[in-house]
From Swiss-Prot:
Catalyzed reactions per annotation: L-seryl-[myosin light chain] + ATP = O-phospho-L-seryl-[myosin light chain] + ADP + H(+); L-threonyl-[myosin light chain] + ATP = O-phospho-L-threonyl-[myosin light chain] + ADP + H(+)
Top-level taxon: Eukaryota
Keyword terms, alphabetized: ATP-binding, Coiled coil, Kinase, Nucleotide-binding, Serine/threonine-protein kinase, Transferase
Stored CDD domains: STKc_CAMK (cd05117)
Annotated organism of origin: Dictyostelium discoideum
Protein kinase domain segment(s): 566-868
Lineage, uppermost ranks: Eukaryota, Amoebozoa, Evosea, Eumycetozoa, Dictyostelia
Protein name per its UniProtKB record: Probable myosin light chain kinase DDB_G0279831
Amino acid sequence: MGHQISKEDNGEQSNSNNLKKERRYTTNSSNLHFLYQQEEGIGINYKTGSANNSLSNSTNSNNNNYNNTNSSNNNNNSGNNKKITESTSLEDFKQFSTTLSISSTTPPDTPIISYNNSNNNNNNNNNNKSNKAVHFTRTRSRSLNITNTSRNLKVTSSPIIDSQVCAPNNSYNSSIQSLNSLSSTNSLSINTNTNTSSSLSLSSNSSNNSLSTLTNTTTTTTTTTTTNTTQQQQPIKGRKSKSSNALFKSLRSSLTGSSSSNSNSGKKRSSSISSSTNSLDINSANNNNNNNNSLKVSSKKSSKGGSPNSSTESLQSLSTSASASSLTSTPPLPPKSNAFSKSQNSSASSLNKQVISSLPPLAPTSTLTTTTTNLEVSKESLKPSSTPIDNNSVADSSYNNNNNNNNNNNNNNNNNNNNNNNNNNKNNNNLLDRLTDQLHRDPFFYNTNTAYQEENIIVEEVVVKEEEKSLPPKKLPPPLPPKNFKQTTTTTATTTTTTTTTMNPPSPIIQNVNRNNSSSNNSSRHELLRKSSGILPPQTEPTYPSETSSKRSSVEIKYLEENHKYQIFDRLGSGTFSDVYLCINKENGKQYAMKIIDKSLVTMIAQHTDMKVETEVNILKQSFHPHVIQIIDHFESELYYYIVTELLQGGELLYQLEKNHPSTNENVSNYTEEHARKIIKQVIQAVGFLHSNKIVHRDLKPENILFRDKSLGSILKIIDFGLASYVDHDCNCNNNNDNNNNNNNNNNNNTNGEVIQPSSPPPTKLIDVCGTPEFQAPEMVKRLGYSYPVDIWSTGIILYILLCGHPPFQGKNNMIVMSLIIKGELNFDSSVGWDNVSESAKDLIRKMLNPDPEKRLTAQQVLLHEWITTSSDVNGSPQLGAPLFYKQLRRYNSQRHFEKIGDTLLKSQRFIYMSPEKDYLKRRSIQL
C-alpha cells in the first residue's frame, strides 16, 4: 500500500516526438473533445494519452490519470460499488506526492515532461489502469493559448472523487484546476486552440486558481483529508515566445475589469514549476451503498522557488474574473444526507486531524463559491534552464518544506492580497483615467460640475482640474458673431449723418483707393469719405463658402435682426457677388433695400482687380443725383457687408416695358420713340454725372436700371455700383485731340528746342474685364485699356434694345458675341423691327456704338444730339415695331431669365479663373 509506481514508456515517447500530423479524438458518449497538434518549430502543444496510445481508455477509466489521491476498489454489498480508502500512515501519505521525471528527447531542446501518478494500493482489477501514465510533450512555439473548457457533470449514485490536473508549469498558460468525478456518466470537455486565451478552467463559474467549496451541513461528519504537495524544484525554462508580449498585452487589456476582494483571491501562480499557486479543493462525496459521506479536502501547496532562476520578477499581474454561464455547465450540488458513516480507520483519522489543523477554518456551506486570483508570469521562467533537475532531491525536500510552506502561506496570501488589490485598482482606473482626462480637456465640458460616486474618481478629477488651471484659457469661436458693437457717428463732407457699426475687436484701417487725384481738394474729400465708410476688409485670406451667396444663412439673418434696427424679409434680386433683400426699419417702419455682399468673394476678386466694397460705398455717398440710387446705411459682420439703400418698387426697365404692353394693359398707350427718348435721356444724365466725378460704372445694362414706381412715366435710377471705379483722367477724345494740337503748336513755336510737357498727365486706363459680355465695349474685349467711353457704349446698346426689342450682338456663346462686338456691324433692317424707327435715332446709335473709343460720343455730346433734344407728342409718334417689337422683347426677356438661372449655377460652382497670359478676370457661362 505504501508502494509508489513511476512508469515511463520510452517507445511511446519516441513515437509522440516523431508525430507531425494533426489528430482529433472525439468521444461522444462522455462528451470529451481534445485537439492537439505537434510539429517542431511551430507551436507549443501538449499531448495527453496512455502508454498504449489509447486516449479514450485512459480518460474513461475509473482511475483518472489526473487523480493524485489513493483510491482502491473493493466489493461491498452489491459487489460493483466503489469505495474510497485513504492511506493509513504518514509514509503512505508522503508517497502520494506527484513524482516528476524528465527525459530528454531529440532534438535536445524539446524536453518531455512526464507526470506519473499511481495508486499505492492496487487490486488485480486496476493494475493495468494504475500503471498508465500521462505524458505532456512541449515543443518550441510562437504562442500558446488554451481556451476555457466546459464540463457537464451529472449526479449519479457513484461518489465524487477529487482530481487535480497536472499541467506543466513552465508553459505560458495559467494553472489548471479541475473537479472530476469517477462516474462513467461524468463528462469532461477540453478544447485547445492557438491564440485564443491563456486560461483553462473546468468550471464556468470559477476562474484560474479559484477556491471551490462544496460542503454539506449534516449532524455527523467524517472528514478525510489528503494533502498533496508539489515539490520545490527549479523551473524548466525555455526560450521566450515571440508573441508572448502580444499575448500578455491582450490578456492585460481584456482582464483589467476584474477585481478580487476576498482574502483567498490574492493568490498568485507563476507559469514556472517552482512558483505554483495554492489551490484548495473541498469535495463532498456521497456513497449510497455504504451510507458513508466524507468531506475530502485536498490541498495543493507549494513554496516559492529559492533558486536564483526561480526568484524572478513578474512581467505583469493579470487578474481574471468569473463570467456567468449556462445552468447546464454548472456542477450540481450533491444531495444532503441525514446520516454519515462513522466507520473510519483510526490511523486515517489521526492523520486527517493533523492535516486539518494546519488548514484555515472552513465555514460549512452548501453553495459553490468562487474567487478570482492573479496570474503572474516570470521572465526567468521563459529562459532556458542551465542546470538539470534532480527528481529525488525534489521529492525528498518537498515534504520537509511542506510545514514551512504552510506557516508562510498566510503571510504570502496577505502580501498577494495587497498587491492584487493595488493592481486591480490600477487596472480598473486605467481606462477611467484616460476617459476622465479626455472629458476634462474637452472645451465644451470645461469647468463643469460633474458628480462622481467613487472617491478615487473624485481625486482624479481634482488633479485634472489643477493641471488645467496652470494652462492658458482656450479661446473658442462663438457660435454667433459677438453682439457688442461700437456705435460711432460720423459726418461726411456733404453734411449727411450716418451711423456705422464696427465689430469688436476693430479691424485695421481700410487701404487707400487706387486712384491718383490731381486736385488736393478732391483727394482730401475722398479720404474723408473712406474714413467715414466704416466698411473694413477681413484680416485673413477668404475661402470659398460652402453655400451659394444667394442663400443666406438663417443664423446670419437672425443675428442681423437682433443686433440692428432692420428686419429682413423677402429677397428682391441677386447679383454676381451679392443679394438684395427687402428690409424695414424698426424705428420708423420705412422700407428699404438691403444689399448683402459676401466678404470672401469680394476679397478674392479684389486681389486681382480694383473692385472694393469701400469704393462702392464711397461712390454712393458721393453720388447725390436724382437718377442714382441713394445710400441709407452700411455696416458689416464677420462674413458679409451690408448696404442699405432706398427701395425702388418699379422693377427693371425691360420687364416694365413688357408688362405695359397694350394687349395686357388697356390703360397703357402704345410704346413709341418718345418713351425710349425719355428713358435714355435719364440714363445719359446719370452717366454724365458719374463721369464728371471721375467715376465709371462699367456694368450698365437693363437689369441695373430700375423704375422708382410701377408707372411707365416714372423716373429711372441706376443701381449696382459694385464694379464702379474711379479713373485718373478725362479720356474725352476731343480733349485729348485739343491737348495734342496745343502741344504741337507749342513745339513748333519753341525755337530753343525745349519740349513742353502737356498740361494734363498721361492717361492711365483701366484694364479689368468686367460686366456682361453683350454690353462690353470693344476696347474692353480687346484688353487694350478703357475709360469713360465704355459706359457710352453700354448706353448705346440699351438704346438699341429700346427701339427694336433685342440687342445688336447676339450669339450662342460669349466668343461669338465678342467677335461680333469687335467687328461692330450694326443691322437696321426692317426684318428685325426697324421700320418705324427714325433716322435720327439710328444716327445716334451709330455714334454711340463706334468701335473707336476716341471717336465715340461723350455724355454731354449725347445730350446735345438732335434726337435727344427734339421732343414730340407721345400719341403723335409712330408705334415702335408694332407686334414684332413685343415679340422680340418677350423673347429677349425670357433669354435673360434663363441666363440668370445659369449665373446662379455659375456662382454656386465658382467657375472663375484667371487668364494664363494676363491677369484678367474672366467668367465662364453655362449654355442652357
